[in-house]
């Protein structure tokens, strides 16, 4: 990890083959072929009119990855991921399709409700440049990563694993917020100047793969992925994580939010991943003074037409929000309507998982 000008750059363990050169003040990518493949032609001693001895292969002549070992490295990483997650019973990705619906907060409190049932729970904060789980869970600066090696991020000789910090109630948490101060950002370096958008997804998922294969997950009942917002991002994570991962979607009683989540449902339905259902978050707010649920949005019930099961409706509780801001996770759910709603969602989630 390199820090420069307030930015954090991660060096990944996967090599992508291309090397970058500068020509006419512009970034240019050129392949680095292995010996025995093609090489730039050189003029023979016979002069300019002589026949060139080496012919450059065309696109359709190249077999495999051109000697970069990308395919081999991807296969090796997949093996590390499979081995690393061998002790995890259920993988559940929590997505929203739209930001601002309280997905990360719900993920943490749902993890708390599951943990209160005696289950072994971990959270992977997959929003690398907008991590929030570290602060909410109270584990900022608590993650130690072994020095990188040729075998990958956080892996020293292939034997050292990243040990995760835990909340006061025993939830293991991986979040970039435990590594990167809030005043700094995570950057994915590009091989071509001004073209970082074409490389970002590749780099980001390579990093996710390294994390999955390098962390000591151990024996878990559930690993919850807190996904970044965006309908397209949700589908990308489904494709990367594979059919073993089930999805739980979060929305609020708003027509706008419902419409975006409906797009996520439509896109996920085309793939092999199972959609467990959705949670209607912030269905109202809990008034401690009057001990009642008050309306928060005007669109109550607008999200009920998603075509997937509703696992529950969770009202907003200002007290829980204050706990998150201070990084004080609740050791056990309070006896409030919010706590009972979260416990209901946890039970419905477990029932859905067990019915697979």
What is each of the regions a protein language model found here?
Residues 88, 99, 125, 133, ...:
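Residue-level signature of catalytic and energy-coupling elements of molecular machines
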Residues 178-202, 207-236:
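Switch II (G3) loop of P-loop NTPases
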Residues 93-167:
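Walker A/P-loop NTP-binding active-site region of P-loop NTPases
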Residues 210-322:
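Conserved catalytic-core segment of NTP-binding enzymes
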Residues 74-90, 135, 141-166, 174-177, ...:
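P-loop NTPase nucleotide-binding/switch module
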Residues 326-335:
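C-terminal boundary of histidine-terminating zinc-finger modules
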Residues 29, 38, 44-97, 142:
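Extreme N-terminal, non-catalytic leader segments
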């Amino acid at each position: 990890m390199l820090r420069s000008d307030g930015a954090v750059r991660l060096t990944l363990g996967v090599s992508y083959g291309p090397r970058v050169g500068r020509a006419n003040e512009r970034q240019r990518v050129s392949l680095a072929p292995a010996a025995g493949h093609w090489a730039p032609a050189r003029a023979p001693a016979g002069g300019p009119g002589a026949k060139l001895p080496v012919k450059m292969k065309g696109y359709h002549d190249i077999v495999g990855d051109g000697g970069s070992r990308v395919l081999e490295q991807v296969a090796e990483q997949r093996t590390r991921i499979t081995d690393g997650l061998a002790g995890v019973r259920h993988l559940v990705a929590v997505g929203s399709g739209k930001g601002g619906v309280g997905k990360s907060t719900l993920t943490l409190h749902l993890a708390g409700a599951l943990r209160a049932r005696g289950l072994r729970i971990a959270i992977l904060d997959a929003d690398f440049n907008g991590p929030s789980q570290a602060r909410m869970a109270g584990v900022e600066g608590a993650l130690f990563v072994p020095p990188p090696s040729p075998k990958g991020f956080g892996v020293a000789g292939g034997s050292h694993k990243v040990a995760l910090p835990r909340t006061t109630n025993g939830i293991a948490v991986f979040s970039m917020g435990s590594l990167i101060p809030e005043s700094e950002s995570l950057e994915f370096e590009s091989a071509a100047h001004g073209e970082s958008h074409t490389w970002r997804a590749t780099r980001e998922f390579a990093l996710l793969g390294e994390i999955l294969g390098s962390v000591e997950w151990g024996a878990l009942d559930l690993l919850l992925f807190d996904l970044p917002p965006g309908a397209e991002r949700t589908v990308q994570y489904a494709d990367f994580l594979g059919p073993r991962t089930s999805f739980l979607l979060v929305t609020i009683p708003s027509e706008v939010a419902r419409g975006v989540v409906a797009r996520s449902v439509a896109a996920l339905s085309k793939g092999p991943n199972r959609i467990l259902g959705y949670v209607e978050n912030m269905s109202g707010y809990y008034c401690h003074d009057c001990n009642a649920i008050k309306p928060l949005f005007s669109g109550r019930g607008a999200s009920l037409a998603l075509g997937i099961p509703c696992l529950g409706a969770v009202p907003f509780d200002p007290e829980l929000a204050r706990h998150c801001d201070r990084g004080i996770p609740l050791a056990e759910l309070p006896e409030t309507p919010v706590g009972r709603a979260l416990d209901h969602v946890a039970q419905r989630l477990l029932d859905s998982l067990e019915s697979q």
